[in-house]
Design a protein with these regions (language model features):
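Flavin (primarily FAD) cofactor-binding/catalytic cores of flavoenzymes
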Residues: 2, 6-53, 57-62, 99-257, ...
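Redox-cofactor-proximal catalytic regions of oxidoreductases
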Residues: 50-96
Length: 454
């Protein structure tokens, strides 16, 4: 509410079918809506566009109980001022999950967090009854003071203001010549419905070594898979396991540094402690509190330099594995069932007998009965479209992402910020530095909600 008692407006200047349209229906969209509602914003002018149930998205729309959150419950936060909210909800509403509790905290199933977000939405009638168009946006174009939005079902709608909350786009195969999806060529493994199509003795190649790869290994072990598993990744490294770190105080980053000073501050902070240690993670988490502001003070060239040289290492340190998945990987490594190959997959061909021939950059080849693509998110076709048609300018160093202001407004081709097009969540990570986890997206949602209701 405004101080004079008036409700804030979300409609902007344009007169179109929707005052505010949130494009995307995953966690980022849900977090923004929850924070808008918490600020008393009227919901009668808000529309959501997205194919999935609100709050599920790629991260939490799982059907596989082996796919778990990679952080303990109290770090999964939609309400920054009440960090234990999900943990308290889970303690009351989740029963019979004997695998959740570990020595360093409770790591619930990914789908449990989706259930929690759904319960938060149901508790707010204005959100539960929001218009939700179950489609995907494929193009956005200017229309007077607002926007026309084309959908993949052939229909269209409009809005005065747009927030792009498109999340992580589905993966593509990490080589030039794309191949068709089949039950044994799993391009998008995030939902977790593929293991039932894999024979227990199948030779499996897993592409990538991050959290999705560990999810795949964990569910295969749980299903008593006895075939060999080969993991192929350029760095040949698995992420470290989560520790029981506590009391990470926010550090103030130095002002006006270049890439070298940015990196030096990080190295000096974590010191020479092995990254497996609890103290190393505590220090690392201290860096993350204000990294977004520090990152935005770097010029684009320095941002690009750091991303090219150290982005992969930051991701490994940032996205540590939950104890359950990490334990499964270590078990299979110890028994020799899992092998890690430091290489890159360059292509896959399939014989008439259904065997997949996996080519590697070194010239080596692997034979597999199934290939699971855990190489990470692909490129967002909607973002690509609005960059190609000039609706938004390209980022200087990450050219497949939009240029954005520190207040999350997309920038026009002429260099001026849009006053009615914003972004939130993973699609902003290149400008915000580290906005991918639930807590950091929640903080971002809180700030954007405050600006939208002004």
């Amino acid at each position: 509410m405004h101080r004079d008692g008036r409700k804030p407006s979300l409609t902007g200047a344009g007169v179109t079918p929707s005052g505010l349209c949130i494009i995307g229906s995953g966690y980022s969209a849900a977090a923004l809506l929850l924070h808008l509602e918490a600020r008393g914003a009227p919901m009668d002018g808000v529309t959501v566009i997205g194919p999935q149930a609100l709050g599920t998205g790629q991260a939490f729309g799982c059907v596989n109980d082996d796919f778990r959150l990679n952080v303990r419950a109290e770090l999964m936060q939609v309400w920054p001022d009440d960090p234990g909210h999900f943990a308290n909800w889970a303690a009351t509403n989740i029963a019979g999950d004997r695998e959740a509790d570990t020595d360093v905290g409770a790591f619930y199933r990914r789908r449990d967090f989706a259930s929690y977000i759904a319960s938060e939405i149901r508790a707010r009638p204005a959100l539960a009854s929001l218009p939700h168009i179950k489609a995907s946006a494929v193009n956005i174009s200017a229309s007077g003071d607002g926007w026309d939005i084309e959908l993949d079902d052939g229909s269209a709608t409009g809005a005065s203001r747009i927030v792009l909350a498109t999340g992580n786009p589905p993966p593509v195969w990490p080589f030039r010549e794309q191949i068709a999806d089949t039950p044994s060529l799993v391009r998008v493994p995030w939902r977790g419905d593929w293991p039932e199509n894999i024979d227990g003795g199948a030779r499996i190649v897993v592409i990538g070594s991050g959290l999705t790869a560990l999810d795949a290994i964990h569910t295969l072990r749980h299903r008593q898979h006895h075939g060999g598993i080969t993991l192929v990744a350029p760095d040949g490294m698995l992420p470290p396991v989560q520790t029981g770190w506590r009391d990470a105080d926010a550090l103030e980053w130095p002002q006006d540094v270049r890439a070298s000073g940015f990196l030096k501050f990080m190295r000096d902070t974590v010191g020479d402690i092995p990254w497996e240690d609890t103290e190393w993670q505590r220090r690392f988490e201290s860096l993350r509190y204000h990294i977004s502001a520090a990152w935005q003070r770097l010029d684009a060239a320095d941002q690009g330099r750091l991303m090219r040289r150290f982005g992969w290492l930051w991701s490994l340190a940032r996205f540590r594995a939950g104890p359950q998945a990490f334990g499964s990987a270590q078990m299979l490594l110890d028994t020799g069932q899992l092998d890690i190959v430091t290489d890159m997959v360059t292509g896959i061909t399939t014989t008439s007998g259904g065997v997949h021939d996996v080519g590697l950059a070194t010239g080596a080849r692997l034979s597999a009965d199934a290939v699971i693509n855990c190489s990470g998110a692909g490129r967002d076709p909607l973002i690509t479209r609005i960059l190609d048609n000039g609706t938004a300018a390209r980022h200087q160093t990450v050219s497949h992402r939009p240029a954005m202001t520190s207040e999350l407004a997309l920038i026009r081709a002429d260099g001026t910020p849009h006053g009615n097009m914003f972004g939130i969540g993973p699609m902003t990570s290149h400008v915000a530095g580290d906005v991918l986890g639930s807590a950091s997206i929640a903080r971002q949602a809180r700030g954007l909600a405050a600006r939208l209701v002004q």
